[in-house]
Amino acid sequence: MHTQWSESQAQAWYQQHDWACGFNYLPRSAVNWTEMWQADTFDAATIDQELSWAHDYGYNALRTNLPFIVWEADRDGLLKRIDTFLTLAEKHQIQVMLTLMDDCAFSGDEPYLGPQKPPRHGVHNSQAAASPGRAIVMDPSQWPRIEAYIRDVLTQFKNDSRITIWDLYNEPGNRGINLSPTESTEYDEALESFALDLMIATFGWARDVGPSQPLTVGAWHIDYQHYGTLEHPIDIAALNLSDIISYHNYNNAARQLGVLESLAQRNRPVLCTEWLARHMDCGFSEQLPLFCAFDTGCYQWGLVQGKTQTWIPWTSVNKDHPAPQSLWFHDVLTPEGKPFCKQEMQLVKGLTHYRQYRR
């Protein structure tokens, strides 16, 4: 079995890649990743168009998730569509981070095949589907199915230079469910302990395959019950097991700076794989220069305004903010490819150009 990369291996890998200025990606035509990747709704033309826009505005990286349910039902077809997607990203000079699992079932449904429900009016990411699904995560007798999926996808693409890094598991233990524009609830708290064990097992399966790309799982508990920042057991394990450190933070620049300074002590490259919450003072003008100064790759949430409705704020923000509709929460481009804010896109292009010549 392969082992965790050394600090020097991780740093050497990082120096071989441009500073990542990217986004979390679903095309505007997909309400969730199941719809994005199923054969009947895989929209290569829209993906091609949107990645062209992203390149033109200066982006060079993206992060996207894969659905276990589609692999299990249509393994060969999914692998071909992944190859098509990677070809399109390479065409537009965009590095790809693939995420294999995800607990963010904000719809409240277990994942299902076929036509997906339409977005619910006014609700942020209303049909988000997990991978493989919270019920399977909480049933270890089903984990051999997950292991087969992890091993197969990694084996198929373990030497593919179009993939720069694997994110094995997005937000393990996330229990959120969005009920309405201003109301949410949570799934069974027991999910967290199962997700922790599954994440640790997944690192083992992935190391056994031994991909040429590094492995990561993002620490994500910034403000969470009685745990300190990134001190939930899931975060501690993720930070200790990852080849490249990654994390999520939707807070203001002062909080972002504190996290960056803390993670720098680990002597590994750092990626912020989720950020951007304009209503919460997590915006471009302060934070993108901060990521650039720390040489921390960053992936904001969302590219084009679409069926995920992630320009609409989280339920908590909708409930408490005095003017929640005054800003977009996530996302940067209209469905016609025009920027929500021209200055944001000027900053993306300027900083990626600046960093390109300083590695």
Q: Whereabouts are the PLM-identified features?
A:
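Active-site mouth of glycoside hydrolases
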Residues: M1-S242, H248, A253-R255, R266, ...
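Short active-site alpha-helical segment characteristic of glycosyltransferases
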Residues: Q287
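Short, acidic, metal-binding catalytic loop of nucleotide-sugar glycosyltransferases
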Residues: L290
